[in-house]
A protein has these predicted regions:
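Enzymes that bind and transform nitrogen-containing heteroaromatic metabolites
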Residues: 1-191
Length: 191
C-alpha cells in the first residue's frame, strides 16, 4: 500500500506558490497526450483520500451544518475521505461511495486511519498544499505528482517551504507538455 500525493495543484515557477486550482481547468484530463496520461493515473488503485479543511470548503464552512463540500451530491472521490480539521462533525455519506469523515489528527494518525479504510489500496493525500507539505515533512509520501504552470501569481501558499533536501529521498522526473505545463513526479527511493 503506497501513499500518493497525486495533486493537481498549480505550482508557479517563481516561488513554488500554489493557487489551489487545476492548470487545465476547462480541459479535464488535459487536451490529450501527456496530460491525459497523467490524468488517467489519478484515480486507479485509490482506496481512501486525506484532505485538509481548506480543500473541503470555504473559510467558515464548519459553521454551516448543511455544507457538504463543493462537489455536489456525487463527489469525484468514490472512497472514504478523511478531512483534517479541528471542527468535529458527523460523517457525511454521499452518492457514489464517497463518505467524508472529519478528524483532528496528526499526519501519522490520519494515515493509519485512512489505510484501515483503504482496503489494501493506496491512500491519496489530496491537498491542499499545507497538508501535502506536512505529510512530506513527516516522510509519509511514497509518490507525488505536481504540475508546474508557467504563470506568475505573486501570491499563494508555498508548497516547498521547510522541505529543503527533499530530492535526496526521491527520484525526481519532469515531463513537459505541449499545453505549457510540466509534470514533476517524485518517487521515494528504496521503497
Amino acid at each position: 500500500v503506497k501513499v500518493r500525493a497525486t495533486t493537481h495543484i498549480s505550482v508557479t515557477p517563481e516561488t513554488g506558490c500554489t493557487n489551489g486550482c487545476s492548470p487545465l481547468s476547462g480541459q479535464p484530463g488535459g487536451s490529450g497526450g501527456v496530460d491525459d496520461v497523467f490524468a488517467r493515473q489519478h484515480d486507479p488503485g485509490i482506496g481512501a483520500e486525506i484532505m485538509g479543511a481548506g480543500k473541503f470548503g470555504h473559510p467558515g464552512w464548519h459553521e454551516d451544518p448543511n455544507w457538504q463540500g463543493a462537489w455536489g451530491p456525487n463527489p469525484p472521490f468514490h472512497t472514504p475521505v478523511f478531512v483534517l480539521t479541528h471542527h468535529h462533525r458527523p460523517s457525511i455519506e454521499m452518492e457514489g461511495g464517497t463518505t467524508f469523515h472529519f478528524i483532528d489528527a496528526s499526519p501519522t494518525e490520519a494515515l493509519e486511519t485512512a489505510r484501515e479504510a483503504a482496503d489494501d489500496q493506496d491512500v491519496r493525500i489530496g491537498g491542499g498544499p499545507t497538508i501535502i507539505r506536512d505529510f512530506l515533512a513527516a516522510g509519509l509520501v511514497d509518490y507525488m505528482h505536481t504540475v508546474v504552470v508557467p504563470i506568475l501569481l505573486g501570491r499563494g501558499v508555498r508548497l516547498w517551504d521547510g522541505l529543503e533536501g527533499l530530492e535526496q529521498d526521491y527520484k525526481v522526473e519532469a515531463t513537459s507538455s505541449p499545453t505549457g505545463v510540466t509534470h514533476v513526479t517524485f518517487t521515494r527511493t528504496g521503497t
